[in-house]
């Protein structure tokens, strides 16, 4: 900064000296003597110096040094001493600017690298336009102009440096509403340029900071909404909140198939998100009939899980009603099919036995079916007779065996008389004509009827 102050002091001294030279007052055309070959040169020099002084007063107003008033000086001889003084002053100014440029080159590059190139281009275009407007147009002269030192390169370099410093000062006074800006890189020593990686990183951070500040001034929130549960980086835009954490929408993925779960439903298992397909395929119970995952309603029976539409009778395929189901070898059956297939059968009607039954003759019987197989009469007193595996009443039992009295038709339980291929009670074996008992055992037979000897002789003798 000391070199800059010295440069400004020398510039002000040179400008004051040029101002004291003054500009020649314009005279009426008729009183002027014919100008020398270079008569237009002092007017051009004074115009340039006045224009340059005005521009510099405008550009370097931040120095806040008073300007000496312009004294009214007499007309100077054309381009005699003023050109020499101006040339010496400009040479001195060029030398000082070269020294300043060599000293502050790295600082200028570092400051300029922190601003977009569009600002520099716009600033240079505005400076060129302002210089074009401030400098008066000089008509072309038929006489060749003498060569003299030019201040264009030196003043442009100084203007660019001052514009960079002004932008840097404005950058330091940004409003506090935005995020804190990264600190400016410290100036490096001459001959040791900063690494390109640090310069590009600083420029990128500065541009991001300016963008966030602009968005904050426009009312757009740029504060981080937490760290992403996947990449562990701050979230500034859209956010997905799930499982007690925040996620970038593109990072909230299914743990099975890596499908984005931003706006769809998901399931959680051990702290990890899953899409419905992966969750059901991996963790849902399987149906005992079709072996497919169960997604909605489920029936639990026989130690396994079932789809409601698949929990049905394995025989007829009908769903179970209010009567429930019966199980056989781990398979469910409806009541009708279970009894039809596995219930004990009645020996009389061959139907399934549901409730009470009678066990007799090595078989099971419905109480209503255990009757005499000939007359279908129930057994009185609970006693029955068996003949060839069939339950019979006493009469039909003796009838089947031939043990009924041929006279009275009642069973012969005690002593009996066997004659004519039949059995008789002893009291009922009598003569057919006189009805006398044939106790002595002698009788005559005629047409399968017994007769005593006298009656037989009497009737058929």
Swiss-Prot record:
Induction: Up-regulated during epithelial to mesenchymal transformation. Up-regulated by TGFB1 and hydrogen peroxide. Changing residue 161 to A: Increase in nuclear localization. Transmembrane segments: none annotated. GO terms for molecular function: I-SMAD binding; metal ion binding; nuclear androgen receptor binding; Roundabout binding; transcription coactivator activity. Phosphorylated by gonadotropin-releasing hormone-activated SRC. A motif (LD motif 1) lies at residues 3-15. A motif (LD motif 4) lies at residues 203-215. A motif (LD motif 2) lies at residues 92-104. Keywords: Acetylation, Activator, Cell junction, Cytoplasm, Cytoskeleton, Differentiation, LIM domain, Metal-binding, Nucleus, Phosphoprotein, Repeat, Wnt signaling pathway, Zinc. Functions as a molecular adapter coordinating multiple protein-protein interactions at the focal adhesion complex and in the nucleus. Links various intracellular signaling modules to plasma membrane receptors and regulates the Wnt and TGFB signaling pathways. May also regulate SLC6A3 and SLC6A4 targeting to the plasma membrane hence regulating their activity. In the nucleus, functions as a nuclear receptor coactivator regulating glucocorticoid, androgen, mineralocorticoid and progesterone receptor transcriptional activity. PANTHER family: LEUPAXIN, PDZ AND LIM DOMAIN PROTEIN ZASP. This is Transforming growth factor beta-1-induced transcript 1 protein. The gene is Tgfb1i1.
């Amino acid at each position: 900064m000391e070199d800059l102050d010295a440069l400004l002091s020398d510039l002000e001294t040179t400008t004051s000296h040029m101002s004291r030279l003054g500009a020649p007052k314009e005279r009426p055309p008729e009183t002027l003597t014919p100008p020398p070959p270079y008569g237009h040169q002092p007017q051009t020099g004074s115009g340039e110096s006045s224009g340059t002084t005005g521009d510099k007063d405008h550009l370097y107003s931040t120095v806040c040094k008073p300007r000496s008033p312009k004294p009214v000086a007499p007309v100077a001889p054309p381009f005699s001493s003023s050109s020499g003084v101006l040339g010496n002053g400009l040479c001195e100014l060029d030398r000082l600017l070269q020294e300043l440029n060599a000293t502050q080159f790295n600082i200028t590059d570092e400051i300029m690298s922190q601003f977009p190139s569009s600002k520099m281009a716009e600033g240079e275009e505005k400076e060129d336009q302002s210089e074009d407007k401030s400098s008066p147009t000089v008509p072309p002269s038929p006489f060749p102009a003498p060569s003299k030192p030019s201040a264009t390169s030196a003043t442009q370099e100084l203007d660019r440096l001052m514009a960079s410093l002004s932008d840097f000062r404005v950058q330091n006074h940004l409003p506090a509403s935005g995020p804190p800006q990264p600190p400016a890189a410290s100036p490096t020593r001459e001959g040791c340029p900063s690494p390109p990686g640090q310069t590009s990183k600083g420029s990128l951070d500065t541009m991001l900071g300016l963008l966030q500040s602009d968005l904050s001034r426009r009312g757009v929130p740029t504060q981080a909404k937490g760290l992403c549960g996947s990449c562990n980086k701050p979230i500034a835009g859209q956010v997905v909140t799930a499982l007690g954490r925040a996620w970038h929408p593109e990072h909230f993925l299914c743990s099975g198939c890596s499908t984005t779960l931003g706006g769809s439903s998901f399931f959680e298992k051990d702290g990890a998100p899953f899409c419905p397909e992966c969750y059901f395929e991996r963790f849902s119970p399987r149906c005992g009939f079709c072996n497919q995952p169960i997604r909605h309603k489920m029936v639990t029976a026989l130690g396994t899980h079932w789809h409601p539409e698949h929990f049905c009778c394995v025989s007829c395929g009908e769903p179970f009603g209010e009567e429930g189901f019966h199980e056989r070898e781990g398979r469910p059956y409806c009541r009708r099919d279970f009894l039809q297939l596995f219930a004990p059968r009645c020996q009389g009607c061959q139907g399934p036995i549901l409730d009470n039954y009678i066990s007799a003759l090595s078989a099971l019987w419905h109480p209503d079916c255990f009757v005499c197989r000939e007359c279908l009469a129930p057994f009185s007193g609970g006693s029955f007779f068996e003949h060839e595996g069939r339950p019979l009443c006493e009469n039909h039992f003796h009838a089947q065996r031939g043990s009924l009295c041929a006279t009275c038709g009642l069973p012969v339980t005690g002593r009996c008389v066997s004659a004519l291929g039949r059995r008789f009670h002893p009291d009922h074996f009598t003569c057919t004509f006189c009805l006398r008992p044939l106790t002595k055992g002698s009788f005559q037979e005629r047409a399968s009827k017994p007769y005593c000897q006298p009656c037989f002789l009497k009737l058929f003798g």
